[in-house]
């Protein structure tokens, strides 16, 4: 077993060896290096064919038509293109958008930008298990609502929103429905032929493909129109200009193909590893799972260890790569806004650790992690005066701290 152990697959995945090998054939003079927009010679045709194959592989995984796939630089750009593109195109119909407080920053910050442009945004609070109350969602709809953006699987707590039901509500009210599926594609079966989803964001690197490439699904029937946010050349049917990075697109396509083939065996394996980890940690005193355990992606476990500071626990676990909060926001020492939205107090939010398992995780690594976490929590609590007071039966909520 190699140290450190990687348990942060929700932040990024290593590129699968099969994917890397395939990508190498699309870079040098000996491979296919042409520009897919070069229509006048074989180098361009070969590159275009490679892009078409990848487009089909991505569409196959989500039950879409390959003409509905637009390549981008990643899920952040896909979120921006979907939300800004739809809001700007349909703004004559209304300027109201619905989203949720626990969305990824790529959605929340995009909505904040639209607010500066004169749009109104309703930010729904989730229930304490992280799920959206469908009645609250319905109640937020106004005559001028044009767009709703709700993620499929949350990147921090792994809860699965009911996008089928939300999609049906949106379709009935003629509202465009965008789903950030960065954390769910390849982990949960998605068939867009059966879902009322109009726009869906995806990433390459969260699925063992390369970083720097993603895609946006844009429904054709009923047709969804977007205003471009990147101009120049009219690539990707005018929605996203720029020379296509063939090697990255080929990598993303191959990664999605492998996921489609292996999902039926891989997800039960990951669930068993996640459950093994949970069963090993759940008996530690004062530990709480964040988010619904029932409606949750099989690879995620987010636990708060009360009376332990999350940052110091991560330091004590330096042989294990885990995170507190998401990779995009864990650099700030603020407690996770996702956990705060669930109603957790600052202390519990600060003591949370996210474990996410993946393709290269083994049982041996999980068992090692369980032992290490147990001893680290025990050690850190021995240093904590709060833990002593809690063990002595002091009601912590009644303590008044004086400012120095």
UniProtKB/Swiss-Prot annotation:
Q: What is the lineage of its organism?
A: Bacteria, Pseudomonadati, Pseudomonadota, Gammaproteobacteria, Pasteurellales
Location(s) in or outside the cell:
Cytoplasm
Pfam families for the chain: Aminotran_5
Binding residues for pyridoxal 5'-phosphate: 75-76, 155, 183, 203-205, 243
Query: What is its cofactor?
Result: pyridoxal 5'-phosphate
Q: Which domain of life is it from?
A: Bacteria
GO biological process terms held by the UniProt record: [2Fe-2S] cluster assembly
EC class name: transferase
Q: Where N6-(pyridoxal phosphate)lysine occurs along the chain?
A: 206
HAMAP family in UniProt: Cys_desulf_IscS
Q: Know the name of this protein?
A: Cysteine desulfurase IscS
Pathway the protein contributes to: Cofactor biosynthesis; iron-sulfur cluster biosynthesis
Could you tell me what this protein does? Master enzyme that delivers sulfur to a number of partners involved in Fe-S cluster assembly, tRNA modification or cofactor biosynthesis. Catalyzes the removal of elemental sulfur atoms from cysteine to produce alanine. Functions as a sulfur delivery protein for Fe-S cluster synthesis onto IscU, an Fe-S scaffold assembly protein, as well as other S acceptor proteins.
**Similarity comment: family membership:** Belongs to the class-V pyridoxal-phosphate-dependent aminotransferase family. NifS/IscS subfamily.
Assembly notes: Homodimer. Forms a heterotetramer with IscU, interacts with other sulfur acceptors.
Query: What positions constitute the catalytic site?
Result: 328
């Amino acid at each position: 077993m190699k140290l450190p152990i990687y348990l942060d697959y929700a932040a990024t995945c290593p590129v699968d060896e099969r994917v890397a090998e395939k990508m190498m054939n699309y870079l040098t003079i000996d491979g296919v290096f042409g520009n897919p927009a070069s229509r006048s010679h074989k180098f361009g045709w070969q590159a275009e064919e490679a892009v078409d194959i990848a487009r089909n592989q991505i569409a196959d995984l989500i039950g879409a038509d390959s003409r509905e796939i637009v390549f981008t630089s990643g899920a952040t750009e896909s979120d921006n293109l979907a939300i800004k593109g739809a809001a700007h195109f349909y703004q004559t119909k209304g300027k109201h958008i619905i989203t949720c407080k626990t969305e990824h920053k790529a959605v929340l910050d995009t909505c904040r930008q639209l607010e500066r442009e004169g749009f109104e945004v309703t930010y729904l609070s989730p229930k304490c298990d992280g799920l959206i109350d469908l009645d609250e969602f319905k109640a937020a709809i106004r005559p001028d609502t044009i767009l709703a953006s709700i993620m499929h699987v949350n990147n921090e707590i792994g809860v699965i929103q009911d996008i089928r039901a939300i999609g049906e509500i949106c379709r009935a009210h003629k509202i465009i429905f965008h789903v950030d599926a960065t954390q769910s594609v390849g982990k949960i079966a998605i068939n867009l032929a059966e879902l009322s989803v109009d726009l869906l964001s995806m990433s390459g690197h969260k699925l063992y493909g390369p970083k720097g490439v993603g895609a946006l699904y844009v429904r054709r029937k009923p047709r969804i129109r977007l205003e471009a946010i990147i101009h120049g050349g009219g690539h990707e049917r005018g929605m996203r200009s720029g020379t296509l990075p063939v090697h990255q697109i080929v990598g993303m396509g191959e990664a999605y193909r492998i996921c489609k083939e292996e999902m039926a065996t891989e997800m039960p394996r990951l669930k068993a590893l996640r459950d093994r980890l949970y069963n090993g940690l759940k008996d530690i005193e004062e530990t709480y799972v964040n988010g619904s355990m029932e409606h949750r992606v099989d690879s995620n476990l987010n636990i708060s260890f009360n009376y332990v500071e999350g940052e110091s626990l991560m330091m004590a676990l330096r042989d294990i790569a885990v995170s507190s909060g998401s990779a995009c926001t864990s650099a700030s020492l603020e407690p996770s806004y996702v956990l705060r939205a669930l109603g957790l107090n600052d202390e519990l939010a600060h003591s949370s650790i996210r474990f996410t398992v993946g393709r290269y995780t083994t049982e041996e690594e999980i068992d090692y992690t369980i032992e290490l976490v147990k001893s680290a929590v025990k050690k850190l609590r021995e240093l904590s005066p709060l833990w002593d007071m809690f063990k002595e039966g002091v009601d912590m909520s009644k303590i008044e701290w004086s400012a120095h």
